[in-house]
Amino acid sequence: MAAPPDLQDEPLSLGSPGSQWFGGRGDGEDEATAVMGARPAQQDGEPAWGSGAGAGVTSSRELCSGPARSPPVAMETASTGMAAVPDALDHSPSSTLKDGEGACYTSLISDVCYPPREDSAYFTGILQKENGHITTSESPEEPETPGPSLPEVPGMEPQGLLSSDSGIEMTPAESTEVNKILADPLDQMKAEAYKYIDITRPQEAKGQEEQHPGLEDKDLDFKDKDTEVSTKAEGVRAPNQPAPVEGKLIKDHLFEESTFAPYIDELSDEQHRVSLVTAPVKITLTEIEPPLMTATQETIPEKQDLCLKPSPDTVPTVTVSEPEDDSPGSVTPPSSGTEPSAAESQGKGSVSEDELIAAIKEAKGLSYETTESPRPVGQVADKPKTKTRSGLPTIPSPLDQEASSAESGDSEIELVSEDPMASEDALPSGYVSFGHVSGPPPSPASPSIQYSILREEREAELDSELIIESCDASSASEESPKREQDSPPMKPGALDAIREETGSRATEERAPSHQGPVEPDPMLSFAPAAALQSRPEPSSGDGASVPEPPRSQQQKPEEEAVSSSQSPTATEIPGPLGSGLMPPLPFFNKQKAIDLLYWRDIKQTGIVFGSFLLLLFSLTQFSVVSVVAYLALAALSATISFRIYKSVLQAVQKTDEGHPFKAYLELEITLSQEQIQKYTDCLQLYVNSTLKELRRLFLVQDLVDSLKFAVLMWLLTYVGALFNGLTLLLMAVVSMFTLPVVYVKHQAQVDQYLGLVRTHINTVVAKIQAKIPGAKRHAE
């Protein structure tokens, strides 16, 4: 048999894997035009799919061997051609849909001049996952041939250009690339509809392969990529060797390799004339087995973890005591490529919406209860039971429940709040674990729910016993902080109510008793109101008792007793009207001042009184600067003289008594920050009250008071004309040290004269007010 003609001088087709195909875009476009013009002729004989495959086989055979030559050994025709021609990408799918029933035409062309590349594995959907490495479809950056590499092609991945009707299996990761690449939406729909289609070799070829050992080098192993490439290279590098084999066997082998080859629509005119001959080809379609689906699903675990929408075969459960199971074996992949909608997944749930709403309302009703009695098993089996401890409102809001049910779809919800002293191995009430459980949705009477019912009944009994003991041991005010520490997951509304109640109690305790009967604080009344609003009456089926109102009634007498015991100390707090004295100085207090004014210690009172008189008389004769300087010199002369005297005396007497002013030096006269703050607050109080009073008088808030102030200022004008300021200060100091003593000695006579003076003053004031119309009406 003659050798096939050398095809290097001819422009290579798109199906050849050589580098000459990438030379220009014009050749590819001409070839695509030629193919589109001849498609109706290919559909006359057989169906579109079979005829396309048959034509491809015949054309490849005729092209390699010539019209008078027997067909050579089948060559693999792996090509990346269509990805490099954007114009061909736009024409080939659309023209196929117009002429035929939507099937893709396949033309297989063997190239005897160029060795095959590893592109045969590039277009397969199985993609040797078992070898543990990624294939060329996932990493096209590793070319194996001397021709231009795939990244140089301006298009996208070649397997994305073809629909899955042509025999290419696509994994879910590849389907996302197909959605981005296909320009025609009909091809996109077909690609999504048929994701798992594989064309396998018929059984006849396997039987004939045993009789022809020379062709065994062409067999492909899906699990050994290296062996596949080496065997194909040996079988193809002898283009001139004729192979006298039967045509059907060659066709079968060619069709077997078409599983790896792309579907090429662009052919030259010469190639198209040869491809009009059709030959029968047997096509078998096999479905992908479930283990393969599991392997492909395990390649993208991140997407499964992020998606919370389960398929009808999986039911996510929300539990409290079981940890999360992240093992791949526990995750069952969806049975179909598409995920169920939210309406479908919710319709298949084990808990209906009405039951969920009833459970939420029941949880709200039991939020502030302190004891709970166990429910019968039949009643709890109808709907999920929610149980919370008193003072621990760990109840999710209805919005949270609806959001969680919408996200998780079919779910079994168990809202169980753990008591910290009920069981040591139980998890906290705020802990929730998510896990996927394969199988049908559980029924309400499943063993897991029955187990949770028994567990909740046991915890309810323990809760009731603990609450009874805690009520006898301490009051509710002592229990609330401990419960807050035991259970951090508490709703913000309940925390706000507790804070407002405690703040109002502190305000009530600090309230002064001289302001009359204590009125109920609005903050204090708000917290119990909020608690009562969120505490509806329990249903008839609940046997739990509500001892909260009696406990609150018992707290009221205790709070009143505490507030009454603290009321005497509250009156001592300085206020705008209650405090009249400044805080005591560290070395001078009120009792010392009284002792000085009443001359109880004559020596000490004489020294202080003489010092004040000397200072004031000096100020009347000299300036303030001169008086300060002279007083400082006098004090220093006295202390220095005394210090020298003591030193000489100790030297003469040969004694060591130390410093004569040692006691005064060790005396603490510093003011602490608290004392300074007290003095500042007291001074601020007086200054603010004085400013307010002056504003009221000068702005005539009260006409009578303003007139009185005017009369006082008028009298002071006469006093100022007669006396100096220092003279008035001297008179005040003298009066301070003399009047108290005189009043003590002549108290009866002084009171009599003071009464007469007070009566006379009141008479004069009455006469003045009678002459002023506005003042008279104001007095009435």
Swiss-Prot record:
Residue numbers bearing the Phosphoserine modification: S13, S70, S327, S350, S352, S487
Cellular compartment(s): Endoplasmic reticulum membrane; Golgi apparatus membrane
GO BP terms in the entry: negative regulation of amyloid-beta formation
Composition skew (Low complexity), residue ranges: 328-341
Annotated InterPro entries: Reticulon, RTN1-4
Compositionally biased intervals (Basic and acidic residues): 497-512
UniProt GO cellular component terms: dendrite; endoplasmic reticulum; endoplasmic reticulum membrane; Golgi membrane; neuronal cell body; nuclear body; smooth endoplasmic reticulum
TM regions (residue ranges): 607-627, 709-729
Residue ranges constituting the Reticulon domain according to the UniProt record: 593-780
Protein's UniProt keywords contain Cell inner membrane: no
Region (Disordered): 1-76, 128-176, 201-223, 293-576
Membrane topology annotation: Multi-pass membrane protein
Keywords recorded for this protein, A-Z: Endoplasmic reticulum, Golgi apparatus, Membrane, Phosphoprotein, Transmembrane, Transmembrane helix
Subunit structure: Interacts with NDRG1. Interacts with BACE1. Interacts with TMEM33.
Function per UniProt: Inhibits amyloid precursor protein processing, probably by blocking BACE1 activity.
Protein name, UniProt field: Reticulon-1
Source organism of the structure: Mus musculus (Mouse)
